Regions:
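N-acyltransferase acceptor-side catalytic subdomain
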Residues: 1-165
Length: 165
Protein backbone atom coordinates (compact mmCIF):
# COMPACT_ATOMS: atom_id res chain seq x y z
CA UNK A 1 0.00 0.00 0.00
CA UNK A 2 1.16 3.49 -0.78
CA UNK A 3 1.90 5.62 2.27
CA UNK A 4 0.34 8.80 0.85
CA UNK A 5 -3.44 9.02 0.86
CA UNK A 6 -3.52 11.95 -1.59
CA UNK A 7 -1.36 10.02 -4.07
CA UNK A 8 -3.74 7.05 -3.91
CA UNK A 9 -6.57 9.44 -4.81
CA UNK A 10 -4.55 10.83 -7.72
CA UNK A 11 -3.76 7.32 -8.95
CA UNK A 12 -7.44 6.36 -8.90
CA UNK A 13 -8.49 9.45 -10.91
CA UNK A 14 -6.83 8.07 -14.04
CA UNK A 15 -6.44 11.48 -15.70
CA UNK A 16 -3.02 10.32 -16.87
CA UNK A 17 -1.39 7.54 -18.88
CA UNK A 18 1.76 5.68 -17.85
CA UNK A 19 4.07 4.13 -20.43
CA UNK A 20 7.28 2.14 -20.14
CA UNK A 21 10.22 2.65 -22.50
CA UNK A 22 8.10 4.77 -24.86
CA UNK A 23 10.35 7.84 -25.15
CA UNK A 24 13.52 7.22 -23.16
CA UNK A 25 15.47 10.09 -24.79
CA UNK A 26 12.77 12.62 -23.83
CA UNK A 27 12.82 11.39 -20.23
CA UNK A 28 16.59 11.65 -19.84
CA UNK A 29 16.58 15.11 -21.47
CA UNK A 30 13.89 16.26 -19.04
CA UNK A 31 15.83 14.82 -16.10
CA UNK A 32 18.95 16.62 -17.34
CA UNK A 33 17.24 20.01 -17.50
CA UNK A 34 18.44 22.31 -14.70
CA UNK A 35 15.94 22.54 -11.84
CA UNK A 36 16.58 26.25 -11.40
CA UNK A 37 17.76 29.02 -13.74
CA UNK A 38 21.52 28.82 -14.20
CA UNK A 39 21.61 25.43 -12.49
CA UNK A 40 23.85 22.58 -13.57
CA UNK A 41 23.28 18.88 -14.05
CA UNK A 42 25.37 15.73 -13.76
CA UNK A 43 23.45 14.30 -16.74
CA UNK A 44 25.76 15.69 -19.41
CA UNK A 45 25.29 15.00 -23.15
CA UNK A 46 27.88 12.19 -22.90
CA UNK A 47 26.01 10.61 -19.97
CA UNK A 48 22.74 10.93 -21.89
CA UNK A 49 24.26 9.22 -24.94
CA UNK A 50 25.60 6.38 -22.79
CA UNK A 51 22.23 5.78 -21.13
CA UNK A 52 20.41 5.95 -24.48
CA UNK A 53 22.78 3.25 -25.75
CA UNK A 54 22.09 1.17 -22.61
CA UNK A 55 18.37 1.63 -23.30
CA UNK A 56 18.77 0.33 -26.84
CA UNK A 57 20.57 -2.69 -25.39
CA UNK A 58 17.70 -3.33 -22.97
CA UNK A 59 19.39 -2.36 -19.69
CA UNK A 60 18.11 1.19 -19.13
CA UNK A 61 14.40 1.83 -18.84
CA UNK A 62 12.02 4.75 -18.51
CA UNK A 63 8.63 5.18 -16.90
CA UNK A 64 6.66 8.10 -18.31
CA UNK A 65 3.56 9.93 -17.12
CA UNK A 66 1.43 11.60 -19.80
CA UNK A 67 -1.48 13.98 -19.31
CA UNK A 68 -3.47 15.15 -22.32
CA UNK A 69 -0.85 13.51 -24.54
CA UNK A 70 2.02 15.52 -23.04
CA UNK A 71 4.99 14.06 -21.15
CA UNK A 72 4.66 15.62 -17.69
CA UNK A 73 6.79 13.40 -15.49
CA UNK A 74 8.90 10.31 -15.35
CA UNK A 75 12.05 8.57 -14.33
CA UNK A 76 14.76 6.35 -15.70
CA UNK A 77 17.19 3.79 -14.38
CA UNK A 78 18.98 0.51 -15.00
CA UNK A 79 17.71 -3.05 -14.58
CA UNK A 80 20.25 -5.76 -13.82
CA UNK A 81 18.82 -9.12 -12.91
CA UNK A 82 15.98 -8.55 -10.45
CA UNK A 83 17.40 -5.21 -9.28
CA UNK A 84 16.38 -1.78 -10.59
CA UNK A 85 18.61 1.23 -9.96
CA UNK A 86 16.75 4.52 -10.27
CA UNK A 87 18.91 7.30 -11.66
CA UNK A 88 16.77 10.43 -11.92
CA UNK A 89 13.19 11.66 -12.09
CA UNK A 90 11.41 14.83 -13.17
CA UNK A 91 7.98 16.38 -12.83
CA UNK A 92 6.27 19.15 -14.77
CA UNK A 93 2.93 18.71 -12.99
CA UNK A 94 2.02 17.96 -9.41
CA UNK A 95 2.55 14.28 -8.56
CA UNK A 96 3.62 13.31 -12.12
CA UNK A 97 6.93 11.77 -11.00
CA UNK A 98 5.20 10.14 -8.02
CA UNK A 99 2.70 8.54 -10.39
CA UNK A 100 5.58 7.15 -12.47
CA UNK A 101 7.36 5.88 -9.34
CA UNK A 102 4.22 4.18 -7.98
CA UNK A 103 3.63 2.43 -11.30
CA UNK A 104 7.30 1.43 -11.48
CA UNK A 105 7.13 -0.10 -8.01
CA UNK A 106 4.02 -2.07 -8.93
CA UNK A 107 5.53 -3.22 -12.26
CA UNK A 108 8.72 -4.36 -10.52
CA UNK A 109 6.73 -6.24 -7.90
CA UNK A 110 4.62 -7.95 -10.58
CA UNK A 111 7.81 -9.04 -12.36
CA UNK A 112 9.47 -10.38 -9.20
CA UNK A 113 12.13 -7.69 -8.86
CA UNK A 114 13.65 -7.82 -5.39
CA UNK A 115 15.58 -4.52 -5.26
CA UNK A 116 14.52 -0.96 -6.11
CA UNK A 117 17.54 1.21 -5.38
CA UNK A 118 16.73 4.91 -5.12
CA UNK A 119 20.41 5.65 -4.38
CA UNK A 120 19.81 8.51 -1.95
CA UNK A 121 17.49 8.98 0.98
CA UNK A 122 15.36 12.04 0.35
CA UNK A 123 12.16 13.29 1.95
CA UNK A 124 10.44 12.79 -1.42
CA UNK A 125 11.45 9.12 -1.67
CA UNK A 126 10.76 8.47 2.01
CA UNK A 127 7.23 9.83 1.45
CA UNK A 128 6.83 7.13 -1.22
CA UNK A 129 7.88 4.35 1.14
CA UNK A 130 11.64 4.34 0.56
CA UNK A 131 13.91 3.45 3.43
CA UNK A 132 17.63 3.40 4.00
CA UNK A 133 19.30 0.05 4.64
CA UNK A 134 22.79 -0.72 5.94
CA UNK A 135 25.56 -1.13 3.36
CA UNK A 136 26.11 -4.80 4.25
CA UNK A 137 22.43 -5.63 3.77
CA UNK A 138 22.45 -3.82 0.42
CA UNK A 139 25.52 -5.78 -0.70
CA UNK A 140 23.76 -9.05 0.22
CA UNK A 141 20.69 -8.01 -1.77
CA UNK A 142 22.84 -7.26 -4.81
CA UNK A 143 24.71 -10.56 -4.50
CA UNK A 144 21.40 -12.40 -4.44
CA UNK A 145 19.40 -10.46 -7.04
CA UNK A 146 21.60 -8.48 -9.46
CA UNK A 147 22.55 -11.40 -11.69
CA UNK A 148 24.85 -10.24 -14.46
CA UNK A 149 23.89 -13.14 -16.74
CA UNK A 150 20.22 -12.18 -17.21
CA UNK A 151 19.04 -11.23 -20.68
CA UNK A 152 18.23 -7.53 -21.04
CA UNK A 153 15.04 -6.59 -22.85
CA UNK A 154 12.71 -3.71 -23.60
CA UNK A 155 9.80 -3.49 -21.20
CA UNK A 156 6.25 -3.66 -22.64
CA UNK A 157 5.14 -0.09 -23.32
CA UNK A 158 1.76 -0.64 -21.68
CA UNK A 159 3.16 -2.79 -18.88
CA UNK A 160 2.42 -0.24 -16.16
CA UNK A 161 -0.78 1.32 -17.44
CA UNK A 162 -3.31 -0.67 -15.44
CA UNK A 163 -6.07 0.83 -13.28
CA UNK A 164 -5.13 1.53 -9.69
CA UNK A 165 -7.48 0.05 -7.14
Amino acid sequence: ALPICSLRKTLRKRNYEVRLDHDFPAVIRACAAPREPGGRTWITPDIQAAYIRMHRLGYAHSVETYMDGQLVGGLYGMAIGKAFFGESMFSRRTDASKIAFAHLARFLEQHNFRVLDCQMTTQHLTSLGGREIPREAFARLLDAHAEADTTPARWPEDGANHPWT
